[in-house]
Amino acid sequence: MVATIEQRTMRKIYWRILPFTGLLYFICYLDRVNVGFAALTMRQDLGLSQAALGLGMGTAFFIGYFLLEVPSNVILHKIGARLWIARIMITWGLISGATAFVSGEWSFYTVRFLLGLAEAGFFPGMILFFTYWFPPVHRGRIIAGFMTAIPISIALGAPVSTSIMELNGFLGLAGWKWLFLIEATPALLLGISCLLFLTDRPEKASWLAADEKAWLAAELKKEQREVEAERTYSVWQAMYNPRVIALAVIYFGIAAASVGLVMFLAQIVKELGLSNFWTGYASSIPYVVGTIGMIVAGFVTDRMGQRRWNCFALCLLAAAGLALAGLTHGTWWSIAALSIATIGFYGMKPSFWPMPSLFLTGTAAAAGIAWINALGNLAGTITPWVVGTIKDATGSFGGGLYALAGFAVLSAIVTVIGVPSTRRRAPRLTAVAEAAAE
């Protein structure tokens, strides 16, 4: 059967964009969280308290991240993803590598703050970039595929990072220094690759035929007309639009729950009586399950077209998994419960992130998406402290898991009361989805 123009076009775009951008995000997330593995020996070498370590890992990083999130995305919209994503990756690679040379508490705070500034705008920039290339019916799947980089980076990051740290003493450098130097290198190389490989807009794509460009331009223009027929927004109107604020609260709740879990997952799993080696592998199980759940959820949300109710159901699933983990912590049942929670965390994202583009376009979309991500990620400065405080007070992670479940319930409630219906008549799924998944 001769492929339709939609099938031909979208197959080319999926294979051109998804593997490369997924690799970028894998490296991005690994460079963000590898400090947790480095801390196994770095904390003692630098004389950092646990409080100082947490302040640098979370608070300093996310303050920097918050400050430049919106400006970064607006700049990307103006000058294009090719140059701006390359800039982001090269600067974060340099700063991540510079972490190898911190010498104490304040230099650690400074480099983490600078890393947050450098990385700001990468994720919302990618979400915005996808709106330039993918019609609405395809966005759930592309976001699902892209965001599988998070659970994969967590699942693989522990053994890779701890293996690098075995270089301790080589050329007179501590293992944690080698960790930062080696894992920063791919960001630098991929940043340069962005200049060669990324294409800002479909009209500049030499790898698309003229009829394919025309079809895609018509599809995206149709979406823009539908959105603008409802209303157009300035940057400031977008940032303070009630729907944008509601989406930010939803993302804050689910980010609070997921960040709180990932920070303490190893300690929760350690309660099963495992060695450090097997704790790492057991900790990866929920994220393998979450990866599968995200991919399936991406197909389901594009087929159904109802982003809001899919998001609501998966937020509740995350809450249920966390509550069950609180009930069963210290037993192997908690691994199953946490796997349910990760399906909810990651499965909701393919339904959630296409929603801003249902009512925002252009610069307003750039600002709105970045604002949602910036406000949501402020959760990273709060939840680890909440879980740790409850653990100190009660001696158990159960109460902390219940608190995280409460944040996920908040997201579910706001999804229902704060987000209007997102149902749009979506074209029938074509074979391109299956082709992209093969």
Give the ranges of each region predicted by the language model.
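Helix-breaking motifs and short loop linkers at transmembrane-helix boundaries and internal kinks
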Residues: 47, 80, 101-107, 118, ...
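Glycine-rich segments within core transmembrane alpha-helices of 12-TM secondary carriers
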Residues: 141-165, 186-187, 373-383
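C-terminal transmembrane helical hairpin of 12-TM major facilitator-type secondary transporters
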Residues: 307-355
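Extracellular/periplasmic helix-loop-helix junction of adjacent transmembrane segments
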Residues: 36-67
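Conserved MFS/SLC helix-loop-helix module at the cytosolic interface between two early adjacent transmembrane helices
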Residues: 67-106
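Cytoplasmic helix-loop-helix junction between adjacent transmembrane helices
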Residues: 111-148
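Extracytoplasmic gate region of multi-pass secondary transporters
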Residues: 35-36, 236-295, 349, 353, ...
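Central cavity-lining transmembrane alpha-helices of secondary-active solute carriers
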Residues: 58-74, 284-297
